[in-house]
Amino acid sequence: MTSPDQLQTFSLRSIAVAAFGPTLLFGIGQGAILPVVALSARELGASVAVAALIVTLIGLGSWFFNLPASLVTLRFGERWSIVGAAVAAGLALAAAATSALAPNGLWLLAAAMVVVGMSGAVFGLARQKYLTEAVPVAFRARALSTLGGVNRIGVFIGPFAGAAAMQFFGISGAYWVGVVAMAAAALLSLTIPDLATPDAPLGGDAGSQPTLRSVAVSHAGVFLSLGMGILLLSALRSSRQVVIPLWADHLGMDATSASLIYGLSGAIDMLVFYPAGRLMDRKGRQWVAIPSTLLMGTALLLIPLTGSFVGLLLAALLIGFGNGISSGLVMTLGADFSPDRGRGQFLGLWRFMADAGSTGGPVLLSGVTALASLGPGISATGVLGFAAAAVFAVVLPRLKHRRNY
């Protein structure tokens, strides 16, 4: 429990540089390369389908490494896990930058993207675990919402930094921006003090350490109820990234118009994360969880009804607002229900479920679109928002006794 003295003396500003700086830099590194990975693959001789697959390797690497990431964090601690993840990502991006010179450049690029995804899993989990334990519960949602928002800002800045570098160094310039950003993230992360974790009981005898299996079994009720809401929310979020450009293309808009709509939606997204975190800290998580999913679900249902630039823009802004206020929600709920012993394992399982939803959302959109058309596919993803809201409305009040505060 947090003492009153800690609450009075704690300030997010006091940990801002060490806590959020590496996340901003890591986001810039990721954002710099995301627009060019497919182009690099095409230059190396990949078909369109293979190029798309290589892009998805980042997400797949992150998804499947969430569980091992919890063990890495347990073994090396938060600080060295964060530093190591940034170093590994930087080395992978350096390999990607030189893939055009390698005999099997396409394979090197693919392997590099897997490592970037794996590094992101370790970095994200260790960062979340660190803030969960370093920040008083009364500030938890604000801290984790800010963490999510800062990462989004970094991913937003990254493509512009990459584009500037490509003017001088060609397509490899984007990767070198990523290398520099990851190196800076690693150096800044060295200033993070390791936390004394409660994984070992007082008295020095560690006893039997919690395992992924034991944590999954003991918290099955949380994973199978609230975890379903997290899975649905993640599917909803990932679908929106695909829906906006696809519907813009369906309406016959050019790439510039589609990019403008997408960018404005992202700008709204980045403006509201801190007020949303403050609301969660003061009123409760459901005050953000339910409205955010309802807003995104409603906006997605409205998109097939739009027929103009203005109509799609308004729907996209609504999506951006809904997504923005949910920034940090997945991490906050994971922190709330994670046990003191086995927190890393719990968060690994939690993030695995979230990434499963992120992978499944576009798959649902693709499947329904193939069976019917794009409009029904988008509507199907919108229904996910209402399903997620229903889960949160029912489950959050019932699981209050399972929280760690």
Predicted regions and their residues:
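Residue-level signature of mid-helix packing/kink "hotspots" within the transmembrane helices
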Residues: G59-L67, V155-F156, G266-Y274, S358-T359
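Helix-loop boundary and gating motifs at the non-cytosolic
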Residues: F10-G59, R237-W247, L251
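Helix-to-loop junctions at the C-terminal end of transmembrane segments
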Residues: F65-E78, V272-G284
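Juxtamembrane intracellular "pre-TM" segments in multi-pass secondary transporters
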Residues: T2-R13, D194-L226
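C-terminal membrane-cytosol helix-exit motif in multi-pass small-molecule transporters
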Residues: V180-L202, V391-L396
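Cytoplasmic helix-loop-helix junction between adjacent transmembrane helices
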Residues: V114-N151, L333
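C-terminal ends and interior cores of transmembrane alpha-helices
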Residues: A88-P103, L295-G307
